[in-house]
Amino acid sequence: MKLTLFAAAAMALCQAQAAEPATSGDLPTVIITGSMPLPTVEQPRDALAAPVQTASAQQIARSGALDISAFLRRNLGSVVVNEVQNNPFQPDVSYRGYTASPLLGTPQGLSVYLDGMRLNQPFGDVVSWDLIPRMAIESLTLMPGSNPLFGLNTLGGALALHTKDGRGSPGTAIEARLGSDQRRGVEVEHGGSNAQGWHWYVTGNRFKEDGWRDDSPSDVRQLFGKLGWSDARTDIAATVAHADNALTGNGLQEQRLLARDYRSVYTKPDLTQNRSTLLNLTGKHQAGEALLLSGNVYYRKIDTHTFNGDLNDESLDQSVYQPGAAERAALAAAGYTGFPASGANAANTPFPKWRCIGNVLLNDEPAEKCNGMLNRSHTRQENYGFSGQFTALADLAGMRHAVTAGAAFDASHATFRQTSQFGYLNPDRSITPVDFFADGTEIDDDGTPVDNRVDLSGRMRTWSVYASDSVAFNQDLTLTVSGRYNRSTVRNRDAITPGGGSGSLDGDHRFSRFNPAIGLAYAPAKGVSAYLGYNEGSRTPTAIELGCADPDNPCRLPNAMAGDPPLKQVVTKTWEAGVRGKLADVARWSAGVFRSENHDDILFVADNQAGFGYFKNFGKTRHQGVELALDGKAGALDFGVNYTWLQATYQSREVVNGSANSSSDADAPGLEGHIVITPGNRIPLTPSHIVKAHVDVQGGRDWTVGLAMTAVSSAYARGNENNQHQAGGPAYLGSGKSGGYAVVELNGKVQLTPRLSIFAQVNNLFDRKYATAAQLGATAFDANGNFAARPLPAVNGEYPMVNATFYAAGAPRSVNVGVRYAF
């Protein structure tokens, strides 16, 4: 009997609608709809040679998650979140040690798709989670490994998001919430359809909070709309999404200052303003009983401004306290009063400013005497493209083939401009600017112009062709073979130093590669299946990585870049194997192993100055581990538990800068030095153990209560790549790692009427103090929180630094309540 695509889709739809656990407790078949970026034939999860994880809109809503990243952290196995920015909408989402982050300077290893459109941005491959409206998401699929069908940057996995439409989400709903730290938000959604085949859906969101850390407000505004038309064979939809957000995330804090005041910030502000507009036209058409055509055309524009108050680390080894005679004369002539005539030092002048102002007036050395800096950047990005594919079903020699083949094109243009203005640090950690910029007008002691300006434009083009054949030999055995060829060109042009040569960012780069994949899924018995898979993926270096690869010229990202030799593209090769099954239609279980090896991995290596570092190709790294999972439903009880053992290690020897590391080869503690990475050293920010568990109880139709726990083991700090740092002496403070932690969330919902419900959530129920990430670096403060230049005696004319561990502190306990009205 022939099975048409239309019948397959209808059957899959019925099963997908049953994917929410039935009241009888039977477990439905899980259908995967996101095995490729574009629509294709839905497949049972057991037919895929990978431990795919999925979630529905109902599951996302029940979790109480603020956004998609929060849901991933709470519910999906092998996922951890590093709160480097300490803003709920700016997390680093890490899966198996591969990251999707909004921060330039974080090596990216995950690709994210929305209705077939790649969300990784052209400049830096970053993912801005604040641009993804949670309420618009109908389902998500997390595909593991370096699956080539998801294109560039799919080194460790791919997240495919699918949005709602008016057919599946009819009606209107209004949701409002209030919470700790002045958190307040309103979401509205409306969907519908008519007999003529038209369907529509729209949702809007406004969210504001003061933030749990000092001076850390955020304002999020999101709008999403979809208009479509469909009949028995065709479905076309046009999507528009707009966001206009202002996010303050004040980043890492030094360990002693964090112990004094958990809500304190190192310096401020750290403001990111994102404005984005996305247009996406998608379509699929059943051209015959066994042929499905699908494709999309898209356009996106993103405008990002950043404004950061930072320490000028060049001042830490300078005499910045007592102004000299010429400086005092200049201050007096300019009308200043109150500056010290003599005797100013660290003890009586905890926040010096007069030498900074005096050197600006004299146009002498403000780059060394001013201890603050205001960094501003502006990034404009546009990208557009299209993709198209066909899926054909055929029976050949008694075997069912599902063949998919397609092509894609993506083009982008990005401009990045940055300026740095000097200033001085205030007691509240803000920076007062002075009239002097790092624009090359001052020459430092080495004879190099002090110039942090960047004016870079880049164009990137990527052509891709891909194909996949899933062969069902019988009901028990499925073989899938696929591959993708990518060809990318990158053209960078430097408006400040054009023409190439030393210091220029000009460059023309070309990258190409064919990435294969093969997988086998076998079901030897009812309720039990096994899989084995191998795949390869690659990513090209981004403009910011190509421009910041010199250890002698580290960058404060995204605030500085320098012309360097081009980096190589990263190639990842992944093996997967595992078994899975059901327990008496009450629970699903799975056990698997994986190994991913990155060749020419691009790593960010920390410099001794906090926030500074550089990119470099590293010979080989390895991510391997074991994953165990159990989830199910027994009566009113819904439960799940995941465990991951992860070993992310370097597999090559390398010498890198390690001045903040106690094991460096520095001539004396606190001076500049290097460390040696050897095979087997663990990669920073990757924990060895991840445990997640949740229990939800359904009290009839009226109420639900849930408890979730996430436990993560310790991880090494950036700057401690050799895993040898030890606290000791006045020059090295802190362990060089972040400790393990466990946090618990409690949420509940009460259905007051068929239309009205209330809900509440308590995050970090036991108010644990913990850190999700760490970095080694020189600190500018003493134990009392006062600025301290030249904190240690000179050694052969050089002043050692006090180096500390900086932590990304986890949010304290917070309570959020809300109400939802649907009609």
Kindly give the residue locations of the regions a language model identified.
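N-terminal periplasmic "start-of-domain" segments of outer-membrane beta-barrel proteins
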Residues: 28-63, 89-93, 110
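A beta-strand signature from Gram-negative outer-membrane beta-barrel systems
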Residues: 33, 119-121, 130-173
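Transmembrane beta-barrel wall of Gram-negative outer-membrane proteins
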Residues: 178-208, 213-250, 269-292, 482-484
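Surface-exposed extracellular loop regions of Gram-negative outer-membrane beta-barrel proteins
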Residues: 244-260, 489-496, 508, 521-575, ...
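Membrane-embedded beta-barrel scaffold of Gram-negative outer-membrane proteins
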Residues: 286, 292-298, 302-310, 523, ...
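Signature of Gram-negative outer-membrane beta-barrel scaffolds
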Residues: 373, 400-525, 642, 655, ...
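Gram-negative outer-membrane beta-barrel transporters
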Residues: 387-392, 474-476, 586-599, 614-721, ...
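C-terminal beta-signal and adjacent terminal beta-strands/loops
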Residues: 538, 710-723, 749-823
